[in-house]
Amino acid sequence: AVTNALKHADRIVSPKYMTAGNGDGGPCHPRDNIALSWFAQEIDLGYDIFGDIMRIREQQAENVAHELCSHGRDIVILGKSFKPETHLTDGSASMLIGHYCEQMHKTVHYDGAPSTKQKYTYLLAHNRDYSNYNFNKDSIIVDLYRKHQDDNNTVIHYGNSNR
């Protein structure tokens, strides 16, 4: 029954959602997972996958923050909203990463660097083309989607075990 149901969920269970990248976000998914986690515990489901999804989201955000902070520079997060093409920041995984960076006493800027001379650690938080973005020279770029190339900066394809 579960397998047959998943066959009809091709809008959600699709390559669009099965790529490396930033954590789940938005005003709906995290809220829904929290409610479903409560319900799973309320009915003693036996395994709370929804709670685990939220714990993993938090842990992954903290892991990315550790990577960003490990370079000792101020941080610029490109992509403050919860997804591209919107200004909504409710449940933004990028802002969660920024929160953890601030807890580690780092200065975080969103969607642009305040200085053109300073070297930053950039986070490419959305799955989009950044090839025309004017990164400050000799900066570090952490790419969650493992696509960006840059000859003037160090690029880290986060999560790539073949680097």
Where do the protein language model's features map onto the residues?
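Structural/interface elements that position substrates and couple domains in central-metabolism enzymes
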Residues: 1-163
